[in-house]
Protein backbone atom coordinates (compact mmCIF):
# COMPACT_ATOMS: atom_id res chain seq x y z
CA UNK A 1 0.00 0.00 0.00
CA UNK A 2 1.22 3.51 -0.82
CA UNK A 3 0.34 6.84 0.74
CA UNK A 4 -1.53 8.99 -1.72
CA UNK A 5 -3.65 12.11 -1.73
CA UNK A 6 -1.89 13.74 1.22
CA UNK A 7 -3.58 16.97 2.37
CA UNK A 8 -2.17 20.44 1.89
CA UNK A 9 -1.75 20.78 5.66
CA UNK A 10 -2.36 19.07 8.99
CA UNK A 11 -4.21 21.10 11.62
CA UNK A 12 -3.68 20.21 15.29
CA UNK A 13 -6.79 21.29 17.20
CA UNK A 14 -6.72 21.95 20.94
CA UNK A 15 -8.62 23.61 23.77
CA UNK A 16 -6.22 26.51 24.32
CA UNK A 17 -5.19 28.36 27.44
CA UNK A 18 -3.93 31.74 28.68
CA UNK A 19 -0.33 32.74 28.09
CA UNK A 20 -0.18 35.22 30.98
CA UNK A 21 -2.21 37.00 33.71
CA UNK A 22 -3.91 39.47 31.35
CA UNK A 23 -5.26 36.56 29.31
CA UNK A 24 -6.97 34.73 32.17
CA UNK A 25 -10.27 36.62 32.36
CA UNK A 26 -10.96 36.81 28.58
CA UNK A 27 -9.92 33.19 28.20
CA UNK A 28 -12.40 32.07 30.86
CA UNK A 29 -15.11 34.22 29.29
CA UNK A 30 -14.53 32.36 26.03
CA UNK A 31 -14.64 28.97 27.76
CA UNK A 32 -17.88 29.68 29.62
CA UNK A 33 -19.73 31.65 26.94
CA UNK A 34 -23.38 30.62 26.86
CA UNK A 35 -23.11 28.48 29.99
CA UNK A 36 -24.62 29.03 33.40
CA UNK A 37 -21.38 29.27 35.39
CA UNK A 38 -21.74 31.16 38.69
CA UNK A 39 -19.59 34.30 38.95
CA UNK A 40 -17.96 33.11 42.16
CA UNK A 41 -16.94 29.86 40.47
CA UNK A 42 -15.40 31.82 37.59
CA UNK A 43 -13.48 34.03 40.01
CA UNK A 44 -12.23 30.95 41.86
CA UNK A 45 -10.89 29.38 38.67
CA UNK A 46 -9.28 32.67 37.63
CA UNK A 47 -7.46 32.87 40.96
CA UNK A 48 -6.11 29.36 40.45
CA UNK A 49 -4.58 30.36 37.14
CA UNK A 50 -3.16 33.57 38.61
CA UNK A 51 -1.63 31.66 41.52
CA UNK A 52 0.49 29.85 38.92
CA UNK A 53 1.50 32.83 36.87
CA UNK A 54 -1.64 33.02 34.76
CA UNK A 55 -0.32 30.59 32.18
CA UNK A 56 -1.63 27.22 31.08
CA UNK A 57 0.96 24.53 30.30
CA UNK A 58 -1.20 23.39 27.41
CA UNK A 59 0.11 25.86 24.84
CA UNK A 60 3.78 24.97 25.35
CA UNK A 61 2.81 21.30 25.22
CA UNK A 62 1.08 21.85 21.89
CA UNK A 63 4.08 23.74 20.50
CA UNK A 64 6.32 20.84 21.45
CA UNK A 65 3.87 18.33 19.97
CA UNK A 66 3.67 20.27 16.72
CA UNK A 67 7.48 20.17 16.46
CA UNK A 68 7.49 16.43 17.21
CA UNK A 69 4.88 15.76 14.50
CA UNK A 70 6.92 17.79 12.01
CA UNK A 71 9.99 15.70 12.87
CA UNK A 72 8.04 12.47 12.47
CA UNK A 73 6.71 13.54 9.07
CA UNK A 74 10.21 14.41 7.87
CA UNK A 75 11.51 11.03 9.05
CA UNK A 76 8.98 9.38 6.73
CA UNK A 77 9.67 11.75 3.81
CA UNK A 78 6.12 13.09 4.00
CA UNK A 79 5.80 16.75 3.04
CA UNK A 80 2.83 18.13 4.96
CA UNK A 81 2.89 21.52 6.74
CA UNK A 82 1.64 21.32 10.34
CA UNK A 83 -0.34 24.13 11.97
CA UNK A 84 -2.18 24.57 15.23
CA UNK A 85 -5.49 26.16 16.22
CA UNK A 86 -7.38 26.44 19.54
CA UNK A 87 -11.02 26.68 20.43
CA UNK A 88 -10.66 29.14 23.28
CA UNK A 89 -7.44 31.14 22.88
CA UNK A 90 -4.80 32.24 20.41
CA UNK A 91 -4.06 30.87 17.95
CA UNK A 92 -7.81 30.50 17.49
CA UNK A 93 -9.08 28.03 14.92
CA UNK A 94 -10.47 30.97 12.93
CA UNK A 95 -7.04 32.67 12.86
CA UNK A 96 -5.34 29.50 11.69
CA UNK A 97 -7.90 28.92 8.93
CA UNK A 98 -7.36 32.49 7.71
CA UNK A 99 -3.62 31.89 7.58
CA UNK A 100 -4.11 28.59 5.74
CA UNK A 101 -6.17 30.38 3.10
CA UNK A 102 -3.55 33.12 2.73
CA UNK A 103 -0.95 30.43 2.11
CA UNK A 104 -3.11 28.77 -0.54
CA UNK A 105 -3.84 25.57 1.37
CA UNK A 106 -7.25 24.16 0.48
CA UNK A 107 -7.49 20.55 1.66
CA UNK A 108 -6.67 20.24 5.36
CA UNK A 109 -6.86 17.31 7.75
CA UNK A 110 -7.56 18.02 11.44
CA UNK A 111 -6.41 16.08 14.48
CA UNK A 112 -8.23 16.72 17.76
CA UNK A 113 -6.29 16.68 21.02
CA UNK A 114 -9.13 14.81 22.74
CA UNK A 115 -9.58 11.25 21.46
CA UNK A 116 -13.10 10.92 22.85
CA UNK A 117 -16.51 11.71 21.42
CA UNK A 118 -18.83 14.12 23.18
CA UNK A 119 -20.29 17.50 22.31
CA UNK A 120 -17.55 19.45 24.13
CA UNK A 121 -14.65 17.25 22.97
CA UNK A 122 -15.77 16.61 19.41
CA UNK A 123 -18.82 18.21 17.80
CA UNK A 124 -18.24 21.67 19.29
CA UNK A 125 -14.85 21.73 17.56
CA UNK A 126 -16.42 20.56 14.30
CA UNK A 127 -18.98 23.36 14.54
CA UNK A 128 -16.26 25.94 15.09
CA UNK A 129 -14.24 24.62 12.15
CA UNK A 130 -17.35 24.65 9.95
CA UNK A 131 -18.07 28.26 10.86
CA UNK A 132 -14.43 29.24 10.30
CA UNK A 133 -14.31 27.70 6.82
CA UNK A 134 -17.69 28.94 5.62
CA UNK A 135 -17.25 31.03 2.50
CA UNK A 136 -13.51 30.41 2.16
CA UNK A 137 -11.40 28.08 0.04
CA UNK A 138 -10.21 25.92 2.94
CA UNK A 139 -11.89 22.56 3.49
CA UNK A 140 -11.18 20.65 6.71
CA UNK A 141 -11.75 16.96 7.38
CA UNK A 142 -11.00 15.41 10.74
CA UNK A 143 -8.90 12.34 11.44
CA UNK A 144 -10.72 9.58 13.28
CA UNK A 145 -10.93 9.32 17.09
CA UNK A 146 -8.06 7.33 18.58
CA UNK A 147 -8.93 6.50 22.20
CA UNK A 148 -7.79 2.88 21.84
CA UNK A 149 -4.92 3.39 19.39
CA UNK A 150 -1.66 1.71 20.52
CA UNK A 151 0.04 5.11 20.32
CA UNK A 152 -2.36 6.35 22.98
CA UNK A 153 -2.68 3.27 25.20
CA UNK A 154 0.90 2.03 25.39
CA UNK A 155 2.45 5.37 26.42
CA UNK A 156 -0.30 5.86 29.02
CA UNK A 157 0.44 2.43 30.47
CA UNK A 158 4.14 3.26 30.67
CA UNK A 159 3.48 6.59 32.40
CA UNK A 160 1.28 4.83 34.95
CA UNK A 161 3.93 2.18 35.61
CA UNK A 162 6.43 4.98 36.22
CA UNK A 163 4.04 6.66 38.64
CA UNK A 164 3.63 3.44 40.59
CA UNK A 165 7.39 3.21 41.02
CA UNK A 166 7.37 6.53 42.90
CA UNK A 167 5.16 5.05 45.65
CA UNK A 168 6.51 3.17 48.69
CA UNK A 169 7.54 -0.31 47.58
CA UNK A 170 5.39 -2.03 50.20
CA UNK A 171 2.25 -0.28 48.91
CA UNK A 172 2.66 -0.66 45.16
CA UNK A 173 0.82 -3.96 44.76
CA UNK A 174 -2.08 -2.67 46.85
CA UNK A 175 -2.34 0.71 45.12
CA UNK A 176 -5.73 1.63 43.67
CA UNK A 177 -5.50 2.88 40.08
CA UNK A 178 -7.77 5.84 39.32
CA UNK A 179 -8.40 6.90 35.73
CA UNK A 180 -9.51 10.51 35.65
CA UNK A 181 -11.36 12.35 32.88
CA UNK A 182 -13.30 15.58 32.57
CA UNK A 183 -16.81 15.26 33.95
CA UNK A 184 -19.85 16.01 31.80
CA UNK A 185 -23.47 16.84 32.57
CA UNK A 186 -25.42 13.59 32.67
CA UNK A 187 -27.76 14.89 29.96
CA UNK A 188 -24.76 15.19 27.61
CA UNK A 189 -23.05 11.99 28.69
CA UNK A 190 -26.21 10.00 27.94
CA UNK A 191 -26.17 11.05 24.27
CA UNK A 192 -22.62 10.18 23.23
CA UNK A 193 -19.94 7.49 23.43
CA UNK A 194 -17.73 9.45 25.85
CA UNK A 195 -18.20 7.34 28.98
CA UNK A 196 -17.86 4.04 27.12
CA UNK A 197 -14.67 5.21 25.42
CA UNK A 198 -13.14 6.49 28.66
CA UNK A 199 -13.90 3.18 30.35
CA UNK A 200 -12.48 1.22 27.43
CA UNK A 201 -9.24 3.22 27.44
CA UNK A 202 -8.95 2.79 31.22
CA UNK A 203 -9.48 -0.97 30.89
CA UNK A 204 -6.81 -1.30 28.23
CA UNK A 205 -4.28 0.66 30.29
CA UNK A 206 -5.12 -1.20 33.51
CA UNK A 207 -4.70 -4.58 31.82
CA UNK A 208 -1.21 -3.63 30.70
CA UNK A 209 -0.15 -2.19 34.04
CA UNK A 210 -1.79 -4.92 36.10
CA UNK A 211 -1.92 -8.02 33.86
CA UNK A 212 -2.67 -10.35 36.77
CA UNK A 213 -5.42 -8.08 38.04
CA UNK A 214 -3.53 -7.31 41.23
CA UNK A 215 -4.58 -3.67 41.23
CA UNK A 216 -8.08 -2.43 41.81
CA UNK A 217 -8.96 0.22 39.23
CA UNK A 218 -11.80 2.69 38.75
CA UNK A 219 -12.82 5.58 36.51
CA UNK A 220 -13.30 8.92 38.28
CA UNK A 221 -14.21 12.41 37.07
CA UNK A 222 -12.83 15.89 37.59
CA UNK A 223 -13.14 19.57 36.68
CA UNK A 224 -16.92 19.87 36.72
CA UNK A 225 -18.27 23.36 36.12
CA UNK A 226 -21.62 24.97 35.40
CA UNK A 227 -24.69 25.20 37.56
CA UNK A 228 -24.48 23.23 40.83
CA UNK A 229 -28.10 22.20 40.25
CA UNK A 230 -27.26 20.20 37.11
CA UNK A 231 -26.21 16.56 37.72
CA UNK A 232 -22.77 15.61 36.36
CA UNK A 233 -20.80 12.39 36.08
CA UNK A 234 -19.55 11.09 39.43
CA UNK A 235 -17.62 10.14 41.47
CA UNK A 236 -15.41 13.20 41.64
CA UNK A 237 -11.77 12.18 42.01
CA UNK A 238 -11.37 13.98 45.34
CA UNK A 239 -14.56 12.55 46.78
CA UNK A 240 -13.54 9.07 45.72
CA UNK A 241 -10.14 9.45 47.38
CA UNK A 242 -11.95 10.32 50.61
CA UNK A 243 -14.14 7.22 50.26
CA UNK A 244 -11.20 4.95 49.47
CA UNK A 245 -9.35 6.22 52.54
CA UNK A 246 -12.38 5.22 54.60
CA UNK A 247 -12.12 1.74 53.09
CA UNK A 248 -8.52 1.43 54.18
CA UNK A 249 -6.80 2.12 50.85
CA UNK A 250 -3.34 3.48 51.57
CA UNK A 251 -2.14 4.49 48.10
CA UNK A 252 -3.62 5.74 44.82
CA UNK A 253 -2.05 6.31 41.42
CA UNK A 254 -3.99 8.57 39.06
CA UNK A 255 -3.81 8.33 35.29
CA UNK A 256 -5.19 11.43 33.49
CA UNK A 257 -6.75 9.21 30.84
CA UNK A 258 -9.08 11.94 29.63
CA UNK A 259 -6.23 14.35 28.92
CA UNK A 260 -3.55 13.04 26.53
CA UNK A 261 -2.06 16.54 26.31
CA UNK A 262 -1.04 18.15 29.59
CA UNK A 263 -3.08 21.17 30.69
CA UNK A 264 -3.94 23.31 33.69
CA UNK A 265 -6.82 21.11 34.83
CA UNK A 266 -4.48 18.14 35.18
CA UNK A 267 -1.94 20.13 37.16
CA UNK A 268 -4.48 21.84 39.44
CA UNK A 269 -7.26 19.31 39.93
CA UNK A 270 -4.92 16.35 40.31
CA UNK A 271 -1.50 17.64 41.42
CA UNK A 272 -2.96 20.14 43.88
CA UNK A 273 -6.51 19.27 44.93
CA UNK A 274 -6.51 15.47 44.61
CA UNK A 275 -3.02 15.24 46.11
CA UNK A 276 -4.15 17.36 49.06
CA UNK A 277 -7.17 15.14 49.63
CA UNK A 278 -4.90 12.10 49.72
CA UNK A 279 -2.40 13.79 52.03
CA UNK A 280 -5.17 14.67 54.48
CA UNK A 281 -5.69 10.93 54.98
CA UNK A 282 -2.00 10.05 55.08
CA UNK A 283 -2.50 8.29 51.76
CA UNK A 284 0.38 7.94 49.30
CA UNK A 285 -0.40 9.63 45.97
CA UNK A 286 1.14 9.56 42.51
CA UNK A 287 -0.01 11.06 39.24
CA UNK A 288 1.03 9.63 35.89
CA UNK A 289 2.31 12.11 33.34
CA UNK A 290 0.32 12.88 30.23
CA UNK A 291 1.48 11.23 27.02
CA UNK A 292 1.97 14.15 24.65
CA UNK A 293 5.76 14.14 25.08
CA UNK A 294 6.13 10.47 24.20
CA UNK A 295 7.49 9.99 20.65
CA UNK A 296 4.91 7.26 20.08
CA UNK A 297 2.15 9.83 20.48
CA UNK A 298 3.49 12.06 17.71
CA UNK A 299 4.05 8.93 15.60
CA UNK A 300 0.40 7.99 16.19
CA UNK A 301 -0.78 11.32 14.79
CA UNK A 302 1.19 10.68 11.62
CA UNK A 303 -0.07 7.08 11.57
CA UNK A 304 -3.65 8.38 11.62
CA UNK A 305 -2.89 10.72 8.74
CA UNK A 306 -1.25 7.96 6.71
CA UNK A 307 -4.12 5.57 7.50
CA UNK A 308 -6.63 8.13 6.23
CA UNK A 309 -4.68 8.66 3.01
CA UNK A 310 -3.87 5.02 2.26
CA UNK A 311 -6.36 2.93 0.38
CA UNK A 312 -7.07 -0.36 2.14
CA UNK A 313 -5.25 0.57 5.36
CA UNK A 314 -6.18 -1.43 8.46
CA UNK A 315 -6.91 0.89 11.39
CA UNK A 316 -4.80 0.29 14.50
CA UNK A 317 -7.10 -0.23 17.48
CA UNK A 318 -6.80 -2.30 20.64
CA UNK A 319 -10.28 -2.15 22.12
CA UNK A 320 -13.60 -3.90 21.67
CA UNK A 321 -15.80 -0.95 20.74
CA UNK A 322 -14.91 -0.85 17.08
CA UNK A 323 -13.14 1.88 15.15
CA UNK A 324 -14.93 5.21 15.41
CA UNK A 325 -15.59 6.90 12.06
CA UNK A 326 -13.72 10.02 11.03
CA UNK A 327 -16.97 11.62 9.87
CA UNK A 328 -19.41 11.78 12.76
CA UNK A 329 -23.00 10.67 12.10
CA UNK A 330 -25.52 13.50 12.25
CA UNK A 331 -27.03 12.17 15.48
CA UNK A 332 -23.67 11.89 17.27
CA UNK A 333 -22.84 14.13 20.24
CA UNK A 334 -25.78 16.58 20.11
CA UNK A 335 -25.54 19.92 21.91
CA UNK A 336 -26.56 19.95 25.58
CA UNK A 337 -30.30 20.38 26.08
Give names to the regions the model predicted.
Residues 2-337:
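Active-site-proximal alpha-helix that buttresses catalytic centers in soluble enzyme cores
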Amino acid sequence: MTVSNLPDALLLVAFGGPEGPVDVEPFLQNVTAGRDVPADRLAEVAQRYLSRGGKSPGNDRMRALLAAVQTELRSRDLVVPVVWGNRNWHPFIEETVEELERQGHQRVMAWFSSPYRSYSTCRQYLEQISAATEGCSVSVERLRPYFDHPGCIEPAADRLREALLTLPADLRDETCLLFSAHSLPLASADTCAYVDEINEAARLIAERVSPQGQHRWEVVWQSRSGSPHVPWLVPDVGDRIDELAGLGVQAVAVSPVGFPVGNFEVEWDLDVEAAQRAAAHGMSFARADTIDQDPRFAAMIVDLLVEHCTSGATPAALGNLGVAPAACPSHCCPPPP
